[in-house]
């Protein structure tokens, strides 16, 4: 699992001690240490870098140089573009975390502040991407919403288009050679929680290469069967979207992602119980790390 941690510049989306630079660094060091000790699954670190966090530039460079991360994504949650093209959705999101009245600011004041913040420069992002690639780290862009953004991603050296906002952008990203990612919860919900692209529709049209767990890990397995039963996708094709394709995107497909001679025996065995897929066995490096037996159900 690639554990995702965000480096935010402020507390727009709520106060979280996990998003401070000290906590992010501590978690990265902990995950790196766990990977070298006894563990049930493989652990990796995904740094989600908000480009309005100008102080994070030096932190990210240090973490890359110390080989603490295995993926980095450039995120821009500035209102008026990306995930928050619709300012009403932005207002609802901000209010969900803390009402503007409690902050003593009007929504317009908050909007102006976040639309005019200093950002990391193109040169800095390119430098981070180059340093990442030198250390065999995959680079992603987040919430791509225009074809122009994709062109910029190409200039920066981005590998992955993570959560493209529209199917047009997802299709273009796929055709340009980016790995395109959608969230599995999107499939279970029947669409984006932010009113953006439908993952199921994009998969049917061949615009999505990878499904990720996003904010609900259990959605990964369930979504594969929903796409088969409800939308007629083949199970092998869907499994590739959560195994082989992600492994290729992360540059680890030599050892992971498919059942082939010479690769690591990392396997998940599932069964159907009461109409829902359930995990019964997990094997890591050929060793069983989890086995679950459901009462009254023979496997």
Indicate where each model-derived feature is located.
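C-terminal cap of metal-dependent C-N hydrolases
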Residues: 248, 260-299
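Hydrophobic residues within beta-strands of alpha/beta enzymes
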Residues: 1-3, 72, 161, 211
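His/Asp/Glu-enriched, well-ordered alpha-helical/loop segment
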Residues: 176-186, 190-271
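Active-site glycine- and acidic-residue-rich loops that bind
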Residues: 47-58, 143-148, 152, 160-162, ...
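Metal-coordinating catalytic core of metallo-dependent amide/deamination hydrolases
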Residues: 6-144
């Amino acid at each position: 699992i690639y554990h995702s941690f965000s480096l935010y510049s402020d507390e727009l989306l709520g106060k979280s001690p996990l998003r401070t630079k000290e906590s992010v660094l501590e978690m990265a060091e902990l995950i790196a240490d766990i990977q070298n000790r006894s563990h049930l699954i493989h652990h990796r670190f995904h740094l989600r870098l908000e480009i309005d966090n100008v102080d994070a530039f030096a932190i990210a460079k240090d973490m890359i140089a110390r080989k603490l991360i295995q993926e980095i994504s450039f995120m821009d949650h500035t209102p008026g573009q990306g995930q928050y093209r619709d300012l009403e959705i932005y207002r609802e999101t901000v209010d969900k975390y803390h009402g503007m009245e409690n902050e003593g600011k009007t929504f317009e004041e908050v909007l102006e502040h976040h639309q005019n913040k200093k950002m990391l420069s193109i040169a800095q992002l390119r430098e981070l991407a180059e340093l990442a690639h030198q250390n065999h780290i995959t680079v992603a862009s987040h919430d791509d919403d225009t074809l122009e953004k994709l062109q910029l991603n190409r200039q920066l050296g981005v590998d992955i288009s993570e959560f493209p906002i529209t199917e047009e952008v997802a299709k273009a990203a796929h055709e340009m050679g980016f790995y395109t990612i959608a969230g599995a919860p999107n499939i279970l919900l029947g669409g984006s929680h932010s009113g953006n692209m439908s993952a199921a529709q994009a998969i049917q049209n061949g615009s999505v290469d990878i499904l990720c767990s996003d904010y609900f890990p259990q959605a990964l397995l369930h979504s594969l069967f929903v796409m088969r039963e409800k939308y007629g996708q083949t199970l092998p094709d869907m499994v590739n979207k959560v195994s082989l394709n992600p492994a290729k995107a992360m540059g680890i497909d030599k050892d992971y992602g498919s059942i082939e001679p010479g690769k690591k025996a990392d396997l998940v065995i599932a069964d159907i119980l009461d109409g829902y897929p359930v995990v019964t066995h997990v094997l890591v490096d050929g060793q069983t790390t989890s086995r679950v037996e459901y009462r009254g159900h023979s496997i």
